[in-house]
Design a protein with these regions (language model features):
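Conserved ATP-binding TGD loop and adjacent catalytic N/P-domain core of P-type ATPases
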Residues: 1-121, 173-175
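Membrane-embedded transport module
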Residues: 93-175
Length: 175
C-alpha cells in the first residue's frame, strides 16, 4: 500500500484529517492504514493541527486538494496539492502532483533523497579535490596555472555529473 511505502520512505506518522463524518473517516482510515485520523475537521482546525505539530519540532507535510485545505497547506513545512484540486490549493502549495494518487509523494520522497545524496557526494568531492590541489600547490608539485586548470575541469565534470537524470527510465516516460 502507499501508506506502507511512505513509512518505508521515512515518514514517521501519517494522519488523515477530513471534513467527512466520523463513520466515513473511520472506515477510510482503517482501509488505508493511517496512524491516526480526525473527522469533521474545519479548515482552521487543520491549520492549527499543523502549527501544533511544527511547535513540537516535527516536520509537517500537508497534502490537500480543496479550498478548505489551503490554510494548512500554507502552514505546513511543505504543502502538496493535487492538480485536479482547487486552484487556490495549487497556488498556495509548494508542490503540485499531477495524479490523484499518493504514489507521486513516494516518488518525490525517493527523488529528494537521491538528490540530497548527490549534492552531499558532490560537495565531498569538490572539497577533497580542492584541498588536494591546495596541498599540491603549497608543496610546489603543481603550478598555479595547472591548479586553476584542474579546478575548472573538476567544476565542469561535477556540473555535467549533476545533470544526469535521477529518475529511472520507466518513471521518466510517466513524468
Amino acid at each position: 500500500s502507499v501508506i506502507r511505502q511512505l513509512k518505508e520512505a521515512g515518514f514517521k506518522r501519517i494522519v488523515m484529517m477530513t471534513g467527512d463524518s466520523e463513520r466515513t473517516a473511520a472506515a477510510i482510515a482503517k482501509r488505508v492504514g493511517v496512524d491516526d485520523y480526525f473527522s469533521e475537521v474545519l479548515p482552521e482546525d487543520k491549520a492549527r493541527f499543523v502549527e501544533e505539530e511544527k511547535a513540537k519540532g516535527h516536520k509537517v507535510i500537508m497534502i490537500g486538494d480543496g479550498i478548505n485545505d489551503s490554510p494548512a497547506l500554507s502552514a505546513a513545512d511543505a504543502g502538496i496539492a493535487v492538480s485536479e484540486g482547487a486552484e487556490i490549493a495549487r497556488e498556495i502549495a509548494d508542490i503540485t502532483i499531477k495524479k490523484d494518487s499518493l504514489d507521486e509523494v513516494v516518488l518525490l520522497r525517493h527523488l529528494s533523497m537521491d538528490l540530497m545524496k548527490r549534492v552531499h557526494g558532490n560537495y565531498r568531492f569538490v572539497i577533497s579535490f580542492n584541498l588536494g590541489l591546495i596541498l599540491l600547490g603549497v608543496a610546489g608539485i603543481i603550478t598555479p596555472s595547472m591548479s586553476a586548470l584542474l579546478h575548472n575541469s573538476s567544476t565542469l565534470a561535477i556540473s555535467l555529473k549533476s545533470m544526469t537524470n535521477l529518475l529511472p527510465e520507466e518513471e521518466r516516460e510517466e513524468a
